[in-house]
A protein has these predicted regions:
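Conserved NAD(P)H cofactor-binding loop of Rossmann-fold oxidoreductase domains
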Residues: 81-87
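Residue(s) in the substrate-gating loop at a strand-loop-helix junction
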Residues: 131
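Rossmann-fold cofactor-recognition segment
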Residues: 45-60
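Active-site helix of classical SDR
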Residues: 111, 147
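Short alpha-helical oligomerization interface
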Residues: 89-101
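Conserved glycine-rich cofactor-binding loop
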Residues: 10-11
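Active-site loop immediately N-terminal to the catalytic Tyr-X3-Lys motif
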Residues: 136-142
Length: 153
């Protein structure tokens, strides 16, 4: 049985990847901030999906990841699709700082936790969603571009 954990599965690419993996017979653990959205997706494939409310910006997120891995019975693939980005023409500091917290701090926290899990277990796969903005840059969203560059490095 193949097992994947998807962080950021409450919408967008993460949600769609979850649906595709379910169709392919994977057992998945899904995590995100919106528990109602997690439960809605879980209801589409009873017995195939475990859920965990998790915010990558919280220091306890790696512990919650390990909880989800235990619920699932292991992890073969870690898929990170959490991230934020906003246009910020006035360079409001809070927008830039929130983007950095999620896309750098949260990214680092979760990928490091997944890496350490796989290192201890003898292997696995890590996949993350980034953006062309990390190589091309978007002047209207400076923190988004910078954080995606960080993820691409």
């Amino acid at each position: 049985m193949k097992r994947a954990i998807i962080i950021g599965a409450t919408s967008g690419i993460g949600e769609e990847v979850a649906k595709l993996l379910i169709q392919q017979g994977w057992h998945i653990g899904i995590a995100g901030r919106r528990e109602e959205a997690l439960e809605k997706l879980q209801a589409t494939a009873p017995g195939q999906i475990e859920i965990q409310r998790l915010d990558v910006t919280d220091p306890d997120a790696p512990t919650l990841l390990e909880t989800l891995i235990r619920k699932l019975g292991g992890m073969d693939l870690f898929f990170l699709s959490s991230g934020i980005g906003s246009q910020n023409p006035d360079l409001k500091p809070e927008i830039e700082l929130n983007t950095a917290r999620t896309n750098v701090e949260g990214f680092t926290r979760m990928v490091t936790a997944a890496f350490n899990h796989f290192k201890n277990e003898g292997g696995g796969h890590i996949a993350v969603i980034s953006s062309i903005a990390g190589t091309k840059g978007l002047g209207i969203a400076p923190a988004y571009s910078a954080t995606k560059r960080f993820q691409n490095t």
